């Protein structure tokens, strides 16, 4: 954009199936970690606003849970509702897919966007992982056939490649307006919420396939004590056997999870953190709408 271009500001929903890199893309555009990431599908469970500020304008990026077909448990239904609800009132949307792959859940995400009547930018992520680079353009042609996109951008969110052109096109789709947030603001979520997410991220990263799906984190205490933040985090599971998995032999796994989460908090919050963690059991919470609401699910 030229220096005489008007300032633009608007909201953009980031939509796609699980594990395509929506949160990595959001973090890359914001320039800071506002959404947790892991290799585990459905890492993102809540809508989260990431604020990306540029000289030409500001993009309010609504990171969302991955749209998926599974509807059996209440938590699956809640996450799908959160993803669909993120499209209300946005100026544009980004459909994130993985380079070289389009499946039924990508089709589901596209249909949801088609019903929303907003301009859609297709972001083809993870192009750095394509072994045969010549396969990219035939894949783009195949995906674009019979589907309308405002723009198509191959990117690597992890390596921050192709993002400048993407930002330029997204800013063209939002209205002329002043920024709604200050330059130093990166999310509308509280530090308390982010603390819980950072603990959950370490659970996913360290337990991998061992991690029970029905695991969530509740921050019971978040208090400033001079220059120190005192945080108490409860990890909820559904069975005693799952509790033992999270704690690990002699408590070593829980200690490691807490230690790594604390370092992430100190980096994000810019303050020393004293973190305590506990593991508790609440049977059937992931299929209980009231329990989900109590734990902060939309």
Curated annotation (Swiss-Prot):
Function recorded in the entry: An essential GTPase that binds both GDP and GTP, with rapid nucleotide exchange. Plays a role in 16S rRNA processing and 30S ribosomal subunit biogenesis and possibly also in cell cycle regulation and energy metabolism.
Localisation: Cytoplasm; Cell inner membrane
Protein name (record): GTPase Era
Gene: era
Region described as G2: spans on this chain: 42-46
Binding residues annotated for GTP, in chain numbering: 16-23, 63-67, 125-128
Region: G4, residue numbers: 125-128
Regions crossing the membrane: none
Span list, region G5: 155-157
